[in-house]
């Protein structure tokens, strides 16, 4: 009877399951890997791509005043070759140059071409004003078959001045223009290099020719260089164009005695615009702010890996194809073993039997928040998210992407590589500088993202620790930590009690007496792992000693009774 009572009491004691509350974090089965300052490939619950790779192969022009120059080159709008007749004056905030576009008709070139192209791309369009030049003693209707309309003609905005008669004397002339506007005036003139000395004499008379141009900030003299050259558009001569920006109230003066291509109208810039050289099709159904030769980049990301020469409000170009920005906490998913044994463990060890600590693992079922609680008591088991700590972490992480964009986005200008021979060294420097900037920004981008990722992971761990400390301070001596993010509570804690722990309203004094009594009972029979090891070794040693003593005793008795004989041979 006494034995039966002892067995029942022992069984009841073993079946009692202590109330417990655990803290954990949200986890997913498959997270996203990010890099930090100290480690590569850390898995996080959420991450956002920061490098745009999707290109729209069209020029998105919705909401923009767009001009497609077609066969007209941008510089041609200032001098007026036949292909640019419809673009002599225009207004636009998006200027599209095509590869087929040409700036000239009579062969030649622009001095400092790329600088002028950049000015016009940002111009917002151009308007013109007549300069008021009149001429006597010369012809002003020079024309060429290279600039054909219905017949031979010339640049619409220029005057080709010739002697009144072939081989006739070209008089010395001086013409001045004062800019009375409030904005700078673009003044363009040309120097004609004849195909031969004989041709120059026929057009402008004999003798040396000299053209001098000056203003308050500019002075330059030009001498034509007649001579044979390869024919282009049927012409062996060349016209080189020069330009200056004339400040308000400043005056430009031209002094010449032949071989001078005179300006007819001054150009004024209208405002601001973007200019891009592209053969992509225009699309009025999409909007864009960032353009490149292959189309449009539409993105809110801070970086792009599409084109290093995109212009407008563009993400920074970087060499990396992907830079993941952590927007969630470090992910430690529940392992597959736990998933397979969940039901078995719950029966055998309770809800928490297969769950590692809040630092070592996460809970995939915690979907209402980033941090939360799981508990077990006499009323059952339950899970609840902690919204305050979740919101605190979210508030600090929200805006990380926007802050990266603010640090990296800027308006870019496109500088072409189409430099003439004189400008090639400058072009090489520009290209080297661009490549160096890309290298620097690629490194900076990786560093910025790594810093933000490090901060995010440290931040989310910090919030978890704060939550853990909050629970520990409430429970005090009423519970014991198990080292896995759980607290074993030494008193009965129903659902209301568990809720008070979560809500930070737990009154430890209310349960102190019961907790102390239960702690004493448990501590009386609890053996730590260190004591268990000592007892096991002691028990093993005692067993071995006892076995050896019994064996020696049996041998001694057998020898004494003559049942065993021991012979020693030397």
From Swiss-Prot:
<comment type="similarity">
    <text>Belongs to the influenza viruses hemagglutinin family.</text>
</comment>
<dbReference type="GO" id="GO:0019062">
    <property type="term" value="P:virion attachment to host cell"/>
</dbReference>
<keyword id="KW-1032">Host cell membrane</keyword>
<keyword id="KW-1170">Fusion of virus membrane with host endosomal membrane</keyword>
<dbReference type="Pfam" id="PF00509">
    <property type="entry name" value="Hemagglutinin"/>
</dbReference>
<keyword id="KW-0325">Glycoprotein</keyword>
<dbReference type="InterPro" id="IPR000149">
    <property type="entry name" value="Hemagglutn_influenz_A"/>
</dbReference>
<keyword id="KW-0732">Signal</keyword>
<dbReference type="InterPro" id="IPR008980">
    <property type="entry name" value="Capsid_hemagglutn"/>
</dbReference>
<comment type="function">
    <text>Binds to sialic acid-containing receptors on the cell surface, bringing about the attachment of the virus particle to the cell. This attachment induces virion internalization of about two third of the virus particles through clathrin-dependent endocytosis and about one third through a clathrin- and caveolin-independent pathway. Plays a major role in the determination of host range restriction and virulence. Class I viral fusion protein.</text>
</comment>
<dbReference type="InterPro" id="IPR013828">
    <property type="entry name" value="Hemagglutn_HA1_a/b_dom_sf"/>
</dbReference>
<feature type="transmembrane region" description="Helical">
    <location>
        <begin position="534"/>
        <end position="554"/>
    </location>
</feature>
<keyword id="KW-0261">Viral envelope protein</keyword>
<dbReference type="GO" id="GO:0046789">
    <property type="term" value="F:host cell surface receptor binding"/>
</dbReference>
<keyword id="KW-0812">Transmembrane</keyword>
<feature type="topological domain" description="Cytoplasmic">
    <location>
        <begin position="555"/>
        <end position="570"/>
    </location>
</feature>
<feature type="glycosylation site" description="N-linked (GlcNAc...) asparagine; by host">
    <location>
        <position position="335"/>
    </location>
</feature>
<feature type="glycosylation site" description="N-linked (GlcNAc...) asparagine; by host">
    <location>
        <position position="30"/>
    </location>
</feature>
<dbReference type="GO" id="GO:0075512">
    <property type="term" value="P:clathrin-dependent endocytosis of virus by host cell"/>
</dbReference>
<feature type="glycosylation site" description="N-linked (GlcNAc...) asparagine; by host">
    <location>
        <position position="46"/>
    </location>
</feature>
<keyword id="KW-0946">Virion</keyword>
<feature type="disulfide bond">
    <location>
        <begin position="60"/>
        <end position="286"/>
    </location>
</feature>
<feature type="disulfide bond">
    <location>
        <begin position="493"/>
        <end position="497"/>
    </location>
</feature>
<feature type="disulfide bond">
    <location>
        <begin position="290"/>
        <end position="314"/>
    </location>
</feature>
<comment type="subunit">
    <text>Homotrimer of disulfide-linked HA1-HA2.</text>
</comment>
<dbReference type="GO" id="GO:0020002">
    <property type="term" value="C:host cell plasma membrane"/>
</dbReference>
<dbReference type="GO" id="GO:0039654">
    <property type="term" value="P:fusion of virus membrane with host endosome membrane"/>
</dbReference>
<dbReference type="GO" id="GO:0055036">
    <property type="term" value="C:virion membrane"/>
</dbReference>
<feature type="disulfide bond" description="Interchain (between HA1 and HA2 chains)">
    <location>
        <begin position="22"/>
        <end position="486"/>
    </location>
</feature>
<keyword id="KW-1165">Clathrin-mediated endocytosis of virus by host</keyword>
<keyword id="KW-1168">Fusion of virus membrane with host membrane</keyword>
<feature type="glycosylation site" description="N-linked (GlcNAc...) asparagine; by host">
    <location>
        <position position="249"/>
    </location>
</feature>
<keyword id="KW-1160">Virus entry into host cell</keyword>
<keyword id="KW-1167">Clathrin- and caveolin-independent endocytosis of virus by host</keyword>
<feature type="lipid moiety-binding region" description="S-palmitoyl cysteine; by host">
    <location>
        <position position="566"/>
    </location>
</feature>
<keyword id="KW-1164">Virus endocytosis by host</keyword>
<keyword id="KW-1043">Host membrane</keyword>
<keyword id="KW-1133">Transmembrane helix</keyword>
<keyword id="KW-1015">Disulfide bond</keyword>
<feature type="disulfide bond">
    <location>
        <begin position="72"/>
        <end position="84"/>
    </location>
</feature>
<feature type="glycosylation site" description="N-linked (GlcNAc...) asparagine; by host">
    <location>
        <position position="431"/>
    </location>
</feature>
<feature type="signal peptide">
    <location>
        <begin position="1"/>
        <end position="18"/>
    </location>
</feature>
């Amino acid at each position: 009877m006494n034995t039966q009572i002892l067995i029942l009491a022992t069984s009841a004691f073993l079946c009692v399951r202590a109330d417990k509350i655990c803290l954990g974090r949200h986890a997913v089965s498959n997270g996203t890997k990010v890099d930090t300052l100290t480690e590569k490939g850390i898995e996080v619950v959420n991450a956002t791509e920061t490098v745009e790779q999707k290109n729209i192969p069209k020029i998105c022009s919705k909401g923009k005043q767009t001009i497609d120059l077609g066969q007209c080159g941008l510089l041609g709008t200032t001098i007026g070759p036949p292909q640019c007749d419809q673009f002599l004056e225009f207004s636009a905030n998006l200027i599209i140059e095509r590869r087929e576009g040409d700036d000239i008709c009579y062969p030649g070139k622009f001095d400092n071409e790329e600088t002028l192209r950049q000015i016009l791309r940002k111009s917002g369009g151009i308007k013109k004003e007549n300069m008021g030049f009149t001429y006597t003693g010369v012809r002003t209707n020079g024309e060429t078959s290279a600039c054909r309309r219905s017949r031979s003609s010339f640049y619409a905005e220029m005057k080709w001045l010739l002697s009144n008669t072939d081989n006739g004397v070209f008089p010395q002339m001086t013409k001045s223009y004062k800019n009375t506007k409030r904005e700078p005036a673009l003044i363009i003139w040309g120097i004609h290099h004849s195909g031969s000395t004989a041709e120059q004499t026929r057009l402008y008379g004999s003798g040396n020719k000299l053209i001098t141009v000056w203003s308050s900030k500019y002075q330059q003299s030009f001498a034509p260089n007649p001579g044979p050259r390869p024919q282009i558009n049927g012409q062996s001569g060349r016209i080189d164009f020069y330009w200056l920006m004339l400040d308000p109230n400043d005056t430009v003066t031209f002094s010449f005695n032949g071989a001078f291509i005179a300006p007819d109208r001054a150009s004024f810039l209208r405002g601001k615009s973007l200019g891009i050289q592209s053969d992509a099709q225009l699309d009025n159904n999409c909007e864009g702010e960032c353009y490149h030769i292959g189309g449009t980049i539409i993105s809110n990301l801070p970086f792009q890996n599409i084109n290093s020469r995109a212009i407008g409000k563009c993400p920074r170009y970087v060499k990396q194809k992907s830079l993941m920005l952590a927007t969630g906490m470090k992910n430690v998913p529940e392992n597959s073993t736990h998933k397979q044994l969940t039901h078995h463990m719950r029966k055998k060890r309770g809800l928490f039997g297969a769950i590692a600590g809040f630092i070592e693992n996460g809970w995939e079922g915690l979907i209402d928040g980033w941090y939360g609680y799981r508990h077990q008591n006499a009323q059952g088991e339950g899970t609840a998210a902690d919204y305050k700590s979740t919101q605190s972490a979210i508030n600090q992480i929200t805006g990380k992407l926007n802050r990266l964009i603010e640090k990296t986005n800027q308006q870019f200008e496109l500088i072409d590589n189409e430099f003439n021979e004189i400008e090639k060294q400058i072009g090489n420097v520009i290209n080297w500088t661009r490549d160096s900037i890309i290298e620097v920004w690629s490194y900076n981008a990786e560093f910025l993202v790594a810093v933000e990722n490090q901060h995010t992971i440290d931040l989310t761990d910090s919030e978890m620790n704060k939550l853990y400390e909050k629970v520990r301070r409430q429970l005090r001596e009423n519970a014991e930590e198990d080292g896995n993010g759980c607290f074993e509570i030494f008193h009965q804690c129903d659902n209301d009690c568990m809720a008070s722990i979560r809500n930070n309203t737990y009154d430890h004094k209310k349960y102190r007496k019961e907790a102390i009594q239960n702690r004493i009972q448990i501590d009386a029979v609890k053996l730590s792992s260190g004591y268990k090891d000592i007892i096991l070794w002691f028990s093993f040693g005692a067993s071995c000693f006892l076995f050896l003593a019994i064996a020696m005793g049996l041998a001694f008795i057998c020898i004494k009774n003559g049942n065993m004989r021991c012979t020693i041979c030397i």
